[in-house]
Amino acid sequence: MSPLRRPLQRRLPLPGQRLVTLTALTPLLLLGACAGEDALNTDEPSDDSGGGQVVIGGQNYAEMQIMSEMYKALLAADGFDVKLTLVESRDVYTPEMQDGNVDVSADYLSSMTEFLNKQENGADAETVASPDPEATLEELKKLAEPTGIEPLEPAEAQNANAFAVTREFAEQNDLKTMSDLAELGEPVTLAAAEDCSQRSDCKLGLEEVYGLEISKVEPLGFGTTGTKDALKSGEVDLGQVGTSDATLETEDLVLLEDDKELQNAENLVPMVNSGFLAENPKVADTLNEMSSGLTTEDLADMIGKVDLKRELPEDVAREYLDGKGLI
């Protein structure tokens, strides 16, 4: 740990801070859910019918629970019977959407672009996503079209990869940007996702783009309680979190600005099966209208209600949509 830092006293995590994850469902289970069988964490159809059935897939943690519940409420208001199936990872629900067993999902612009890029061009494919959301969207459209899925309009809201320090450390050393941290010239210990050491947007990029010396990576997870506790206790200097993390202020953690644009654009974007969209073009209007007004601040506020206040994602989603006059 840098000698410029005084460790903070360790505090217990806040009650609602743990992210919810599930063991990934197999495509067979997803297919069964689409065929009408009960599957883990799959909702029953909504009562308001008239537009046919729509299956929403996605990842099972607070942010994506909220996004999926907003999509569900909007499409139910349009007269669809909605089934919601949440799983652990993108590589479970995306193939199901490509096959037409899942109709709609919320995703992250660059992450989805690179998922399809590697699916098409191999694990060593050159990165095509960038910090520019418009350019990245064009790349996503090109990669998605032959797979049978289509991106709609991205929201301003995003949860990009970011790095935080304690407020005390930032104030002691006048840190506002990642370049400020690099200028201290001290080795940095980092708590991050397990694959951070191999990622160009984590350890590799921090060293190459910012010139940081990462002396150790503790694989405590992306934005997890463990990562935040390690920051607060002084075990590490820097922690990998998301830009929409609603707990940072209450934890006395602050984001350092990515002033050299290491991170790619991770705007939230609706992804839709192309065949389903061709049969139901109004879905694009409905989801695009919501995306056009959704900000990162809105998203962080909703995540805080779920993670900190323990409100239900469904209730938080409906409250937001009702407040915006969308349902």
Language-model region placement:
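Acidic helix-start/capping segments at beta-turn-to-alpha-helix junctions
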Residues: 86-102, 109-115, 121
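Short helix-initiation/N-cap motifs at beta->coil->alpha
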Residues: 62, 83-95, 194, 215-229
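C-terminal motif of bacterial Sec signal peptides marking the signal peptidase cleavage site
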Residues: 29-33
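Bacterial signal peptide processing site
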Residues: 35-38
